[in-house]
Regions:
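A conserved amphipathic alpha-helix that caps or lines the catalytic cleft of carbohydrate-
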Residues: 4-5, 84, 145
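Alpha/beta-hydrolase-fold serine-hydrolase catalytic core, especially in secreted/extracellular enzymes
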Residues: 31, 36-39, 155-156, 173-174, ...
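Gly/Ala-rich beta-loop-alpha elbow adjacent to hydrolase catalytic centers
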Residues: 71-76, 80
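Serine-hydrolase catalytic machinery in alpha/beta-hydrolase-like enzymes
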Residues: 1-62
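The feature captures the conserved acid-bearing segment of alpha/beta-hydrolase catalytic domains
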Residues: 99-182
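A short, hydrophobic beta-strand element of the alpha/beta-hydrolase
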Residues: 94-96
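Conserved hydrolase catalytic core segment
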Residues: 82-92
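Short helix-capping segments at alpha-helix termini
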Residues: 6-10, 62-63, 88-89, 113, ...
Length: 188
């Protein structure tokens, strides 16, 4: 929170919620490479409904109709990009190291334009150099997502930032940078 305050002069309200079964709550569809649990991929719509029908109404009743940025790290970033293609409730997406390597993501993204006005993507510069054959595609997947977003949005309303390191490390800092970039974009 402190880093976010340092990175953006904008006032903000931050709301988070716990997902005990994060893969179940955030995966938009099943992928055995993420989990063999058959429940994975069945509950992202429930999570989105919670945000739209419970969380956002409470926030709006307390703070007014503020712009809403959705974001997260890893599967949270994937969920944010998916959610912002399913509803226009979000003005921006802060996707730090999103898990875009899942099976079927690029076909989905090509068929479903982002409904938010701006999007931040980031990736660690060593993430695509892992041994896992599925996950090592992440660099190409994020570059393709960025190209899609550049075609859909005003070019200045999307960015792809490369961070030093792999997937694990400085997750909070990377996520704060993503949200700050979005906040600075929508403040005007």
């Amino acid at each position: 929170m402190q880093m976010l305050q340092q990175l953006s002069p904008c006032g903000f309200v931050m709301a988070t919620f716990d997902t005990c079964e994060w893969a179940r709550a955030l995966m938009p569809w099943h992928d055995d490479a993420v989990s063999r649990d058959e429940e994975v991929g069945l509950h992202s719509r429930d999570t989105l409904c919670f945000i739209l029908n419970e969380l956002l109404p409470v926030l709006r009743s307390r703070y007014g109709n503020l712009p809403c940025i959705i974001g997260g790290y890893s599967l949270g970033g994937l969920f944010a990009l998916w959610a912002a293609r399913e509803t226009d409730a979000f003005c921006a997406v802060a996707a730090a190291s999103p898990s875009l390597w899942i099976e079927g993501w690029m076909l989905y993204a090509q068929a479903h334009p982002l409904l938010a006005k701006c999007a931040y993507l980031s990736l660690g510069d060593r993430e695509e150099h892992c041994r896992n054959q599925r996950m090592c595609r992440i660099g190409d997947c994020v570059r393709l997502e960025h190209e899609l977003l550049r075609m859909q949005l005003v070019e200045s309303n999307t960015t792809l930032q490369w961070n030093p390191g792999g997937h694990f490390g400085e997750e909070a800092e990377r996520t704060a940078k993503a949200f700050a970039w979005c906040m600075n974009r929508i403040k005007g």
